[in-house]
Amino acid sequence: MTYVLFLLSVSLVMGFVGFSSKPSPIYGGLVLIVSGVVGCTIILNYGGGYMGLMVFLIYLGGMMVVFGYTTAMAIEEYPEAWGSGVEVLVSVLVGLAMEVGLVLWVKEYDGVVVVVNFNSVGSWMIYEGEGPGLIREDPIGAGALYDYGRWLVVVTGWTLFVGVYIVIEIARGN
């Protein structure tokens, strides 16, 4: 399981390197969506089933809509991929070399020293448990958001609506 998480972490970082090397919006959106799926899989492996599902549905659903729209607005006849230009290819290869160097350095020293200590965050940690008296906190948190934080949900929805309206007005050009 450790090697699976290690491989997922490396692929998550490589997805960020692939996006930050500034390819065409088509490929950049694809890399962000794949990186989001990998991040949700990491959350699922740590025991956060509900949180991983919600991030997958909300974040990736929004990302697909946004990148579908930006791809339609910025369509190119010959989109720039990672191997089409020397600058893009060099930046991807430099990022890959840095990631491989970091992985080899971590494997050489047999681990990483923890700099940040999480002592008093017991209720925020993702955990897995199967028992009659155990209540998982991630689904209850969503219920509390809609019960006690109903105005936060309304403000968030209104903010998203205004953001979409502003993007449409900017893209329209009037």
From Swiss-Prot:
Alphabetically, which GO biological process terms does the record hold?
A: mitochondrial electron transport, NADH to ubiquinone; mitochondrial respiratory chain complex I assembly
Membrane-topology annotation of the record: Multi-pass membrane protein
Give the main localization category: mitochondrion
State the similarity comment: Belongs to the complex I subunit 6 family.
Assembly and binders = Core subunit of respiratory chain NADH dehydrogenase (Complex I) which is composed of 45 different subunits.
- Identify the EC number(s): 7.1.1.2
- Broadest EC class? translocase
This chain's protein is named NADH-ubiquinone oxidoreductase chain 6
**Which Pfam family is one of those matched by this entry?**
Oxidored_q3
Q: What is the purpose of this protein?
A: Core subunit of the mitochondrial membrane respiratory chain NADH dehydrogenase (Complex I) which catalyzes electron transfer from NADH through the respiratory chain, using ubiquinone as an electron acceptor. Essential for the catalytic activity and assembly of complex I.
Q: Where in the cell is it found?
A: Mitochondrion inner membrane
**Superkingdom of origin organism:** Eukaryota
Q: Does the keyword DNA repair apply?
A: no
Give me the Gene Ontology terms describing cellular component: mitochondrial inner membrane; respiratory chain complex I
Molecular function (GO) terms listed? NADH dehydrogenase (ubiquinone) activity
Q: Identify the keywords attached in UniProt to this record, alphabetized.
A: Electron transport, Membrane, Mitochondrion, Mitochondrion inner membrane, NAD, Respiratory chain, Translocase, Transmembrane, Transmembrane helix, Transport, Ubiquinone
Q: Which reaction does it catalyse?
A: a ubiquinone + NADH + 5 H(+)(in) = a ubiquinol + NAD(+) + 4 H(+)(out)
Transmembrane intervals: 1-21, 24-44, 47-67, 86-106, 111-131, 151-171
